[in-house]
A protein has these predicted regions:
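Cytosolic regulatory/linker segments at or just downstream of nucleotide-handling modules
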Residues: 152, 181-233
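Catalytic NTP-binding/metal-coordinating core of nucleotidyl cyclase/transferase enzymes
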Residues: 37-117
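Acidic/histidine metal-binding catalytic segments
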Residues: 94-95, 135-146, 187-193
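Alpha-helical scaffold within the catalytic cores of cyclic-nucleotide enzymes
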Residues: 72-88, 104-145, 149, 170-179
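Helical mechanochemical/support elements of P-loop NTPase systems and associated helical scaffolds
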Residues: 14, 26, 68, 75, ...
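Conserved, well-folded catalytic cores of nucleic-acid-processing
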Residues: 21-24, 122-132, 160, 175, ...
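Catalytic strand-loop-helix junctions within cyclic-nucleotide turnover domains
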Residues: 101-111, 145-163, 184-185
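Regulatory cytosolic signal-relay segments
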Residues: 1-44, 202
Length: 233
């Protein structure tokens, strides 16, 4: 009986912690295979995707709050559907930014490929998002996406009553910096992501760009992605 109670408490904790951002399928897999879940933090190679809407502050000041949040939530719904489809897991919404990880909590050897394909699908979906915006007399919006593959420390932050699954580390910060270099409608990925993403990734013929992100000691080579397979931006 004590074992059954402990298992129920554990399941409740996992559902509270992960249920807000993992798909039902992934959540059930975690509950059925506790070896896939490392509570307390672990280092793992993952691919991190961060997206951000351009000029959102100006939009929020021009639009009434109800309309702005309705527009934002519709955008989130569209993006979440795509991220889930490509086996990504959303860790946070920071304002209008989406922070997603591929390869955690479930390992995924194709995390770089999935994240890059996901980003292309997200940018392609923006046409439909803006068609809906215009039908509601909302302004068109655009976003930039940064992707990097590297090591992060992942685990639960908080307590048994209130916890959040999150990631920290240099490579998480670098992904945010990469996103900051993107222009509207652009996808920039690191050398590490491009090398691991596979041959279906289509890079801009203009070639890579060398940048020095703030807070990063070394120069970083970034690649402008314009498609995945036959799906072009």
């Amino acid at each position: 009986m004590l074992l059954t109670l402990a298992m129920k408490l554990w399941e409740t904790f996992i559902r509270r912690t992960f249920g807000r951002y993992l798909t039902d399928e992934v959540l059930e897999e975690l509950l059925n295979d506790s070896n896939e879940l490392r509570i307390g933090g672990e280092r793992r190679e993952v691919t991190i995707l961060i997206s951000d809407i351009r000029q959102s502050t100006e939009l929020s000041e021009k639009m009434d709050p109800v309309s702005f949040f309705r527009m934002l939530n519709h955008y989130f719904e569209e993006m979440i559907e795509i991220i889930n489809a490509w086996r990504g897991n959303i860790l946070d919404f920071v304002g209008d930014s989406i922070v997603a990880v591929f390869g955690a909590p479930k390992p995924n050897e194709l995390s770089a490929r999935d994240a890059t394909a996901c980003a292309v699908a997200m940018q392609r979906r923006m046409k439909a998002v803006n068609e809906w915006n215009l039908s509601q007399e909302y302004p068109e919006i655009s976003m930039g996406i940064g992707i990097h593959t590297g090591e992060a420390i992942l685990g639960n932050i908080g307590s048994m009553t209130r916890a959040k699954y999150d990631m920290i580390g240099r490579d998480v910060n670098l992904t945010s910096r990469i996103q900051g270099f993107t222009k509207s409608g652009q996808i920039l990925v690191s050398d590490e992501t491009l090398a691991a993403a596979g041959s279906l990734v289509v890079e801009n013929e203009a070639g890579a760009i060398l940048v020095r992100p703030k807070g990063i000691q070394n120069d970083v080579l970034l690649h402008d992605i314009v498609g995945f397979g036959d799906k072009l931006l």
